[in-house]
C-alpha cells in the first residue's frame, strides 16, 4: 500500500482532514457583543458628522456671500445709472432762474408796442431754444392748468374760488415747475380752485 492509497480513519485522505480542520478554525471567531464598539468607529462617525456640519455651514456662508455680492453689484449699477441720469440736475437748477427771468420778461413786455416787437421776438426765440436744449436732456416743464393738484409736482400757495375750474384742480401757475427724467427738481407753485 502506497502512502497515497493510505487512508486515515473513516476513509479520508490526510489533505482532506487538514482542510476540514482549517475550516473549523475559521468558523470559530470571537463573538463581539453589541456593547463592545470599537472606539475608532465611534470617533470616525463623530468626525463624519462634524465634517458634514462644517460643509453645511461653509455652503451657507458661500451662498450668503454670493447673495451679498450680487446685491452690491446691483446697487452699484443702479447708483451709476442714477448718477448718469441725474448728473445734469445741478446744472439745470442753475439754469432755472435764467429761464424764469426770460418768462417774466415776456410777461411784462408790451407786445402791442411795435418798437419792442424785435426785442420780444428775440426773448421768445431765446427762451424757446433754451427749453428745446434742456428737453433734449430729459427736462420737462410743469405748467398745465385745470389738472388735478398733484403734490409730487405742485406746491399749492393759495386757494381761490372758481366757477370755471373744478375744485382741487390747478387754477393758475405762479412759477413753472420742472422735472428731470421724471424726477421733480422744482415743484410748480400754483393756485388751486376751491368750491364756492
UniProtKB/Swiss-Prot annotation:
Alphabetized GO MF terms: adenyl-nucleotide exchange factor activity; protein homodimerization activity; protein-folding chaperone binding; unfolded protein binding
Superkingdom of the source species: Bacteria
Keyword match Metal-binding: no
Keyword Cytoplasm in record: yes
Cell location: Cytoplasm
Keywords: Chaperone, Cytoplasm, Stress response
Region: Disordered, residue numbers: 1-41
Gene3D superfamilies given in the database record: 3.90.20.20, Head domain of nucleotide exchange factor GrpE
InterPro entries in the cross-refs: GrpE (IPR000740), GrpE_coiled_coil (IPR013805), GrpE_head (IPR009012)
UniProt-listed GO biological process terms: protein folding
Any Gene Ontology CC annotation: cytosol
Family of this protein: Belongs to the GrpE family.
Assembly, per entry: Homodimer.
Role of this protein: Participates actively in the response to hyperosmotic and heat shock by preventing the aggregation of stress-denatured proteins, in association with DnaK and GrpE. It is the nucleotide exchange factor for DnaK and may function as a thermosensor. Unfolded proteins bind initially to DnaJ; upon interaction with the DnaJ-bound protein, DnaK hydrolyzes its bound ATP, resulting in the formation of a stable complex. GrpE releases ADP from DnaK; ATP binding to DnaK triggers the release of the substrate protein, thus completing the reaction cycle.
Protein name: Protein GrpE
Organism expressing this protein natively: Klebsiella pneumoniae (strain 342)
Gene assigned in the entry: grpE
